[in-house]
Amino acid sequence: SLAGLFGLLANAVSGRVTFGLGTMFALGAVATVFCWPHRWRHERWAKALCAAPLAALSTMSSPVSGLFVGLVAVALFLQKRRPGAWALGLAPAAVVALSAWLFPFSGTQPMGFGSTVLPLLYAGFVFAFVPSTWKTVRITSAVYGLSVLLVWVISSQIGSNITRLSMLFAGVALVAALPFTVPRTRKWYALVVALAGFVGWIGFKSADDAVHTTPAASWARELAPLVNELQEVGAEKG
């Protein structure tokens, strides 16, 4: 929980407010699928009716968070857990398709190879360090790693936004795997080093984002006369 809180706070410091909102709905959708009460296990339609709107709200808040819900849906689909896959996957796809039809958009966000290194590395760490019985986590990390490579190779609107999933939840998966690793073995030490690296990565990236996204005081001061002149001539009226 603390590892997740650290990732979410770092995301807020970086200024990704709408993505944070979308992540809240995304977590709700995923929790609905995986934490559905056992006594209602046969009520699959009820589960879908709860998970799908949350997945849709996640995508409406932030298409990037909707994309990450889709990655979990793919992992479930590959395990032949089709009801959960459809519940999580169809709503984000419908929201994106409707948005593209109503509000056509174009352009791409560049993503250099350097931006892929750490997300790929931590996708590999999660795949390697979590227990082999955690199939959904391992498949999701593998699908995510492949997605990072595809986004780097193929220019799209996603770009470096794909890195956010590992920045939020790689630490959570690694911390969760720690109690299942034999202490003071090579794997345990490697896992601890990976966790320390994750904390350093997220801490540095958040501080860097905060520094570079804060408007300079001189910019605000020098812009004030121009804004005042525009207001006096009624520029806001067109």
Annotate each PLM feature.
Residues 1-37, 47-77, 97:
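Membrane-embedded helix bundles of polyisoprenyl
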Residues 2-5, 35-56, 82-91, 138-144:
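Short hydrophobic alpha-helices at membrane interfaces in multi-pass membrane enzymes
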Residues 28-35, 72-80, 124-128, 167-185:
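Transmembrane alpha-helices and membrane-interface helical segments
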Residues 54, 80-100, 193-197:
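Hydrophobic alpha-helical membrane-interfacial segments at the cytosolic entry of transmembrane helices
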Residues 82-88, 126-142, 178-189:
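Membrane-interface helix-loop-helix junctions at transmembrane boundaries of multi-pass membrane enzymes
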Residues 93-97, 103, 107-173:
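Alpha-helical transmembrane segments at the extracellular/periplasmic loop-to-helix junctions
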Residues 182-203:
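Signature aromatic-anchored transmembrane alpha helix within multi-pass, membrane-resident enzymes
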Residues 199-238:
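Extracytoplasmic
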